[in-house]
């Protein structure tokens, strides 16, 4: 019996030690210094999407460039599908804020699960194109984001781009708000989207994105919304016959770094991280825009029926959502509203 108890105690200690190691392994772990006295780092980064997405490709480019330019002094391991937070994207950004991991690519929608002000840029029908969205982020909007992220312990390394969010469903093409009535859509855990879909007569529900394919396959939900890259890389064409291109919400990507980690770096490493992050963002945006038309064609070839809303149809949705803009200005605050919400909405 004493021997058995000792083994159990040892196993318990080992389990606790492993948990501690895993918890600390994302915190900008350093591994001594080089011969010339520079600090070595082993960092971790997550993306919400899978390994065929432009998010992942850009993150891998960032990792490869860091390792190459530092001769292996800095390495970065990229994890797909929010693996470090068991698929929970909001928990993932909280890890970044708390320093349990080092970098992430996340949508502002996910940050809005922590602070709803971050969702302002994704408000419905405020941008006509991805170029309009990027222009807003290059100006006052980007600085407001940087300030608010800093308050939450995240250093902004710029923006990538997931694109305009589109709609898929099982039952019919969507042309008017009435076409949404009674349909159950999976949405991110984001109050704005919940109110938006209810206002349009749909039945919104939230769940981790990793569960969406199975829920669609089993008929537990009727549809979902996401950018084309995410729809394609998640193989939703296998379980969704209808795709509506309505460009209702612009979805940039926040490339964030734990701020304490960034502040702990020397100026040379800070400059290096900033420069290579900018390169990764530019690469991701280019790949995303270049690939979208081709991906839509491939979705059609796979059997999806695709319809695109006219300007008049978009105006009908915009008119139906006017109460949302009025209500959410109080949530977004003056800084975010001024930076992103057009006058008259």
Which residues fall in each region the model found?
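Short, low-complexity disordered leader/linker segments with a strong preference
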Residues: 1-42
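N-terminal secretory/targeting leader peptides
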Residues: 28-127, 151, 156-345
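A gly/proline- and charged-residue-enriched helix-loop-helix capping module
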Residues: 128-148
